[in-house]
UniProtKB/Swiss-Prot annotation:
Record carries keyword Nucleotide-binding: no
Annotated membrane topology: Single-pass membrane protein
The name this protein goes by in its record: Taxoid 7-beta-hydroxylase
InterPro entries documented for this protein: Cyt_P450, Cyt_P450_CS, Cyt_P450_E_grp-I, Cyt_P450_sf
PROSITE patterns xrefs: CYTOCHROME_P450 (PS00086)
Location, primary (coarse class): membrane
Binding-site residues, heme: 446
Lineage: Eukaryota, Viridiplantae, Streptophyta, Embryophyta, Tracheophyta
Record's subcellular location: Microsome membrane
Pfam (any one): p450
Superkingdom: Eukaryota
Pathway in which this enzyme or protein is active: Alkaloid biosynthesis; taxol biosynthesis
Amino acid sequence: MDALSLVNSTVAKFNEVTQLQASPAILSTALTAIAGIIVLLVITSKRRSSLKLPPGKLGLPFIGETLEFVKALRSDTLRQFVEEREGKFGRVFKTSLLGKPTVILCGPAGNRLVLSNEEKLLHVSWSAQIARILGLNSVAVKRGDDHRVLRVALAGFLGSAGLQLYIGKMSALIRNHINEKWKGKDEVNVLSLVRDLVMDNSAILFFNIYDKERKQQLHEILKIILASHFGIPLNIPGFLYRKALKGSLKRKKILSALLEKRKDELRSRLASSNQDLLSVLLSFRDERGKPLSDEAVLDNCFAMLDASYDTTTSQMTLILKMLSSNPECFEKVVQEQLEIASNKKEGEEITMKDIKAMKYTWQVLQESLRMLSPVFGTLRKTMNDINHDGYTIPKGWQVVWTTYSTHQKDIYFKQPDKFMPSRFEEEDGHLDAYTFVPFGGGRRTCPGWEYAKVEILLFLHHFVKAFSGYTPTDPHERICGYPVPLVPVKGFPIKLIARS
């Protein structure tokens, strides 16, 4: 509603009030309030009209282009969604997503603006409903110094030094999983099995949960919670969000009992401070000697469980799908991994030294992340008006950076639609800054990226040791990105060829 329409509406309402013979005091108060609103709207309207907003379209009221965005998620056409608008409006364009005016920034400059200006120009933006599901004390939601402290705490488990302690255990878990659930099978569904694998790893490495029934409980709860992220956030019967809230409460009940038990075990020295993620977070002290609250420990255990489950399972599945279409790349992975295996003694597990030797396999993983990154990008909210590329992005608007605007552009990656791991064979630094951003960047770089890297490389190592090859039952299986990160719609069923 513009200022003139509001004035006309206000006059009509005022006439109704005066006809009801309201008291002079009430009329005076009402007129003052209405006048103030009108003045404020006129000023805001004039200010907004004086700004050079990015080109684009906001779509239908409230809905905006959310339906088109979700449709693109479902059909794996997010790249086209971005490129069509970029081609029409330029590297900076406006739209409306989830009921809010949004600016999408394309190219390295846009990525740099968002990823290098956390808490300077922009801050993380979650709806209250989603924040409640993620955990109000989680590293994904917290800002400023609270966020910094949580990252330091998580690094004790997820960083390189922490991973040194757990890599052997993770390697054994993955080897045993493949021996038990893959070997001896003619055909398997990759997505289904890697979900089981990642869930098992997380339950054991994060919480020391070995009980199958308890792991299955967490698994079922997690599937409901992740499915709710793009649902309508209404807490009423029949909606996924309500089921997710109930699931969160059930999950909290399960893990709260574990937390109390672990605190007792740590006090009595029946558990070590680095036994798993739960122990690491309970034992953490910041620079002032202050521990994390129980709520922060639980919320961040939840957050790591959620993050490791969906993005890692997506990439494990997609990397096998891409290698199936590029057999020469698969053979190079096989050669590298079998050479590493040949240098191990019977029963000796993979070490961080071995991970560093997986240079080509790491290139394959990076190329898979470039071509099919599980994450489209992330949202931020502007803290003040921002001037960028000749346009003003108003305070309070959403801003989105996206992997699609650089990962699949010929100007940054030659032949972007071709699977070429060799493009990453040079040492770090050969890529232009902010062109390859699968894990985000800046203060909010994915805290678990090294953990995910190690888990995926270990999976590939044990997979090629067990199988000399595989063939997809549907080589042209479609990719879908809704409601979870990109995955093949059928889960990528494959026929296995056992290594003799």
